[in-house]
Amino acid sequence: MVLANVYDSQCQERLEIVPYQGEEIPFAVQRPIWPDFYPFIIIFSLTLHFNNVSIINNMGFFSIFSREKKETLNQGLEKTKQSFFGKLSRALVGKSSVDDEVLDNLEEILVTSDVGVDTTLEIIQRIEQRVARDKYVTTTELNHVLRDEIVGLLTESGAQDEQEFAIPSGKKPYVVMVVGVNGVGKTTTIGKLAYQFKKAGLKVYLGAADTFRAAAVEQLCIWGERVGVPVIKQNMGSDPASVAFDTLASALANDADVVLIDTAGRLHNKKGLMDELSKIKRVMQKQIPDAPHEVLLVLDGSTGQNAFEQARQFTAATEVTGMAITKLDGSAKGGVVIGVSHQFKIPVRYIGLGEGMEDLQPFDRKEFVDSLFSEQV
């Protein structure tokens, strides 16, 4: 039996001793807590309680976030909107109806807006069917038709108008494993989620399971101290699965609502990644049999087509159930939200629209499309 010392986010107050029992996982005895800016596999656990009354049946997972962020959404998508509709307006000059030339131009615009080839062809095919059915579609109506088809694609991928990702009763803690490569903003995403969860009255734990990089652990600890939540860590080189085990054990022992575990996001090779994620899942299940309840993939929206390749590699390595797409405010590549969600049939859960704590928003398909097409339809 190995004993793990667990400390608060200041790495001072000892909270408990957690016995580890199960398959052999080498790790150090002393494990203070720290944080990281390049999170890779995060694990959250969540149950909503207010005044000691569970409200999970009346309140979705994403409902705890403020919905008064329309202005932030509009500003964050401004570059994408200007680029896309600027190209579209130029392509429609002198045209009164949608014909083959208009559709060819639209196809090129969608591809260059990082919607992706497969998704673009699907959109064009649907518009062609609409034109054939209605016999005549004006260029003015094209924006409305295009908007409807994008909403339809996001709907088919599981995106919601109201984020109704309800937490089942008895799932405390609710466990989410978040995966992604280095540098996509995973640690920032973890920190902002921790902040918003805590602000909503939830008890949050972080686990620094990226044991391959000292900077990762330190950066996660910065977020833990900034937000005021405990962070569980081990020494460099320890097994990430053992950090996940310790974090869930501490979360259970201390009645936590949310646990975010940050682990390495190295795309070394498909088999290595798959083995690592599988082991983390297997070890977590020694604490919580049905963990993880969600696997969240974090992608950098500003990388455009690279986001598709990252999604391809992670979906091949593990089951991904949701995505967070960050850094949408810094580029005109917002089309990646539509394309990657449609191509991999995975709903977008969050979008990052700035550096502020409140700028990580739960994704709402209707608000997203309304903002993208605002002042255009």
Regions flagged by a language model, labelled:
Residues 6-8, 21:
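Alpha-helix boundary/capping motif
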Residues 47, 53-86:
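N-terminal accessory targeting/assembly segments
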Residues 74, 78-209, 216-236, 244-252, ...:
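Primarily NTPase-proximal linker/entry elements flanking Walker-type ATP/GTP-binding cores
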Residues 219, 236-254, 268-377:
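Conserved catalytic-core segment of NTP-binding enzymes
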